[in-house]
Amino acid sequence: TQDLLVRVSQAYFDVLAAQDTLTFVQAQKTAVSEQLASAKRNFEVGTSTVTDSREAQARYDLVIAQEIAAENDLRVKKLALDQLVGVTNAQPVPLAQPVPLPRIEPANVDYWVETARAQQPGVRQAAIALDIARLETQKAETGHRPTVDLQAGYNITRNPNGTLTAPGVNSRTNVASIGVALNLPLFAGFAVQNRVKETLALETKAEADLETARRNVAQATRSAFFGVQSGQGQVQALEAAEASSQTALDANKLGYQVGVRINIDVLNAQSQLYQTKRDLAQARYNVLLGTLKLRQAAGTLGLEDVQRINSLLAPAKQP
């Protein structure tokens, strides 16, 4: 169940990321198209060179290629989501704006590691396997030991025709017995010893499997925890970079209008802005998905965690 929740969430965010990429590429195409038209007008009136027009045309052609790739990627991601949820043409709801990303609570990696070592399904399964192996060893070792059986019986004998001493007299005899039997095992050709050795080997293997499971879970939990922390830092940095990129683009546009910047400066600033927007959107999805993966690694992922993610989505549009 936990694996299914993560896979569906992954496919859901993949579609949203692909939609964002297409949206940003189309917005960049519009901006480059306007810059291309401006470069052509300036060339016609003699205020710019043909190089400006050619640079803008080359950038426009590149964005067209990126748009085609983004459209195809979105189709592929939607097909993957449809196949996973069993719905044709599923329409994921985007994140609300602004996006209040959840914090890790508690923000202590040791807490999550200890929780994982105790509750992760793989660890619990390995612990149960070890308990079974120990019971099998104890069972095999009893082959060397004497056993005591409690025996009890009750017998009723009816004589409708009487007995030799009392012919013709109907009689019934009740006999009850109880006793204890002591069984001493004899030499059985090393069968018991071999069985004990086998169960001890299986017990040792089960102990090693449990320790391996605990180490793997601890490593996966730490990786997930630090991944979410790093992702949250990246989101903050990219939010600042987005604002800076927008300011840089505005400054380059103004500089181009007054003749202190050239066309390629504006085109590069546009590319930087929309690339930052794409990176920021992807980083947000990575944080949300990483939060689910952290809880999965700790063995605590449930529907309530998915519902908390759902609360961050924008209200669904009414038909």
Language model segments and positions:
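Structural signature of outer-membrane beta-barrel channels/translocons
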Residues: 73, 142-144, 183-187, 286
